[in-house]
């Protein structure tokens, strides 16, 4: 929103949440600021939109009306309209399973499933080889302060896992 003429080759919107309303004044203002990136896409550009929320799904429908833009729906919740989605630890596309994310410690959870879906589509859109992208997932080290394992304590009634997610910007993002 600080670069009104920003026109990427690949634009990604994962989700919208009301945690930035102080900056945008309203949810509608926030959505409009995010949508501006898609308005500026040139023919042949790719719009990657998470469709797990109703606002995001509505934006995906709008993006699909732009004939010159390749619009790709992604989901962290196995949304049936998504071209790439996460389900029970696996990343899928319309041809079937892509990669078992549950076997990759740094890519656990539906939120990382959605992140992986976006990365997968973005990389392919940029010309990367499908198998190279799949291999890259296995070597992903994770990001500092983002779901970074700190340690575990085992006890009589189970165990507690400590995770550093200090970059989470709201309570919903940090509740895992």
Where are each of the predicted segments found?
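Acidic, Mg2+-coordinating active-site environments of NTP-dependent enzymes
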Residues: 2, 6-160
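AMP-binding/adenylate-forming catalytic core of the ANL superfamily
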Residues: 166-176
């Amino acid at each position: 929103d600080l670069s009104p003429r920003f026109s990427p080759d690949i634009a990604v919107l994962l989700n919208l949440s009301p945690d930035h309303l102080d900056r945008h004044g309203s949810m509608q203002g926030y959505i409009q600021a995010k949508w501006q990136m898609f308005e500026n896409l040139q023919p042949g550009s790719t719009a990657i939109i998470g469709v797990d929320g109703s606002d995001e799904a509505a934006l995906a429908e709008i993006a699909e009306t732009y004939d010159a833009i390749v619009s790709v729906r992604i989901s962290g919740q196995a949304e049936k309209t998504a071209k790439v989605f996460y389900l029970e630890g696996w990343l899928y596309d319309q041809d079937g399973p892509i990669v078992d994310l549950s076997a990759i410690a740094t890519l656990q959870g539906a939120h990382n499933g959605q992140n992986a879906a976006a990365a997968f589509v973005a990389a392919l859109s940029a010309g990367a080889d499908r198998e190279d992208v799949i291999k890259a997932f296995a070597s992903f080290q994770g990001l500092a302060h983002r779901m970074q394992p700190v340690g575990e304590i085992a006890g009589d009634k189970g165990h507690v896992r400590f995770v550093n997610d200090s970059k989470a910007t709201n309570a919903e993002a940090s509740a895992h």
